[in-house]
Amino acid sequence: MGVGIPAEFEDRFWSRHSNPRSGWTRVPSGAIIVYAVYRRNWRVLGAALVWTAINPFLFPPPETEDAWMTRAVLAERWWVREETNRTVGLGYPNICNTVGALGFVYALYAAWRQSPKKATLGVVASVGLKLWWLRVLVTHYDRRTG
């Protein structure tokens, strides 16, 4: 997660976040945040931000690693920790995550400017590219562990 984070906290975060319910219920968070900005609904925005922050701690660790989203979260941790990669960059597959993050910033800007089509395009690009990035990581992770 980052420098200075106690290992026990980091392990707890990743083990709980790897529950597929944690991963899949976070996927729409970006869209809800963009919607809240578009509607200028600060309560919804606050709730979505709190949800995004606490979500990984709300679910127990998964019983198995069979679910795709479980492997996606484990692959992300493996990619960053064991392979010493970053989550963004210009090389493949990190470019997917980088452009996806820029798509999310674009979506927020479009929402603020009250442009729903552009905001939707940004959200779809952001989520699609994040899932693409995860798909690539899962493929590498499955080869390594399989």
Where are these regions (language model features)?
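Short amphipathic, positively biased membrane-proximal segments
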Residues: 1-146
